[in-house]
C-alpha cells in the first residue's frame, strides 16, 4: 500500500521551483493561504492509528510519503518533527519517504539516536535546476541515510546528475514537470538525459509526469493534468521498463494515478491489476 502522511500542512516558498507551488494553488481554491503552517491533528499519528480489530490502519510493508503539502525540514515544524521521528522509529515495518529542499537543515535536525540512519527511511532531495542540484546533492552525499534519492520537480531547466549518480549512493531518481497553474516547459531531451545517466549506473528512474507544457522534437504539447502521467509512461523513459501500456489491464482510475509505477494497491480500490 502506498499512502501519504501529512503531519503538518503549509510551507514557505524557498527557491525557484516553488514559484507556482501546487499546494498554494490547491489551498487558494479553498480560500486558504498555503503559507499558513499548522499541525494536522486528525492525521498526526497516522502510522500508529489502529482499527477496531487492533491492527494498524497502515499495514506492514506500506510506503508512506511524508509531508507532500509541506517540507519535512521546515523550520516551523521543528517541535512536531521530534514526535514524528519517534513514530518512524516505532514502525520499522513500513517505509517512510521523506522529501526536502532545505538541505542545510537536515543534519542539525536528526534525532540524537539516529546514528547512521534507519533502514525504513529514504531521504529524497528535491531539485529544480542545476544550481539547486549542486547545492543540495553535495550535502546529501555526506548525510547519514541508508537510502537516498533525487527528485527533479518541477524540472525547469536542464540538469546533469552524472557526478552524483556515479558515487553509487543514490537508489532512485524521479522527474516531473510543472502542473496546476504553472506553465514552465519540460523538454523531452532533459528527461532523456537523466534517464540515460540512470541507465548508465543502473539506478531506478521514474518519469512521473510531463507537466502542463511538454516540448519534444521542437513541438510544444499542452497536456491536461489527467494525462500527464499517462504520456510520461508512454515515453518508456522508465528504468526498469516493467510494462508496456497494451500489456496491462488496470482499473480505469489508475490510468491517471501518479503512483502507478510503484503501486502495490491503494486505499480506494485495493483491486489493482498492476502486479
How should these model regions be labeled?
Residues 2-121, 130-134, 159-170, 266-274:
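Conserved Radical SAM active-site core
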Residues 3-9, 162-275:
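Auxiliary Fe-S-binding modules of radical SAM enzymes
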Residues 18, 66, 98, 140, ...:
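Conserved, mostly hydrophobic/aromatic
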Residues 84-88, 137, 191-195:
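Generic structural signal for well-ordered alpha-helices
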Residues 89-92, 144, 192, 199-200:
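Anion (oxyanion) recognition and catalysis
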Residues 98, 123-125, 150, 207:
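Structural beta-sheet core signal
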Residues 102-103, 154-155, 212:
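Conserved beta-strand edge residues that scaffold enzyme active sites
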Residues 125-133, 138-172, 177:
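Histidine/lysine/aspartate-rich catalytic loop segments that bind and position anionic ligands
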Amino acid at each position: 500500500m502506498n499512502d501519504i502522511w501529512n503531519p503538518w500542512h503549509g510551507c514557505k516558498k524557498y527557491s525557484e521551483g516553488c514559484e507556482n507551488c501546487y499546494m498554494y494553488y490547491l489551498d487558494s481554491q479553498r480560500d486558504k493561504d498555503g503559507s499558513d503552517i499548522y499541525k494536522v491533528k486528525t492525521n498526526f499519528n497516522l502510522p500508529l492509528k489502529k482499527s477496531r480489530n487492533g491492527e494498524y490502519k497502515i499495514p506492514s510493508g506500506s510506503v508512506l510519503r511524508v509531508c507532500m503539502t509541506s517540507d519535512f525540514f521546515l523550520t516551523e515544524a521543528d517541535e512536531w518533527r521530534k514526535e514524528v521521528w519517534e513514530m518512524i522509529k516505532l514502525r520499522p515495518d513500513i517505509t517512510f519517504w521523506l522529501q526536502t529542499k532545505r538541505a542545510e537543515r537536515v543534519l542539525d535536525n536528526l534525532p540524537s539516536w539516529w546514528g547512521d540512519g534507519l533502514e525504513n527511511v529514504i531521504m529524497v532531495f528535491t531539485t529544480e535546476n542545476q544550481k539547486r542540484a549542486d547545492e543540495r546533492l553535495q550535502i546529501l552525499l555526506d548525510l547519514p541515510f541508508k537510502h537516498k534519492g533525487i527528485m527533479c520537480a518541477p524540472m525547469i531547466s536542464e540538469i546533469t546528475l552524472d557526478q552524483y549518480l556515479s558515487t553509487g549512493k543514490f537508489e532512485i531518481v524521479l522527474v516531473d514537470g510543472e502542473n496546476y497553474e504553472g506553465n514552465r516547459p519540460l523538454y523531452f531531451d532533459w528527461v532523456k538525459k537523466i534517464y540515460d545517466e540512470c541507465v548508465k549506473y543502473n539506478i531506478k528512474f521514474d518519469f512521473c509526469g510531463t507537466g502542463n507544457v511538454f516540448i519534444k522534437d521542437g513541438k510544444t504539447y499542452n497536456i491536461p493534468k489527467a494525462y500527464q502521467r499517462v504520456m510520461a509512461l508512454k515515453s518508456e523513459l522508465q528504468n526498469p521498463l516493467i510494462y508496456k501500456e497494451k500489456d496491462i489491464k488496470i482499473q480505469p482510475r489508475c490510468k491517471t494515478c501518479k503512483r502507478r509505477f510503484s503501486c502495490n494497491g491503494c486505499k480506494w480500490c485495493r483491486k489493482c491489476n498492476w502486479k
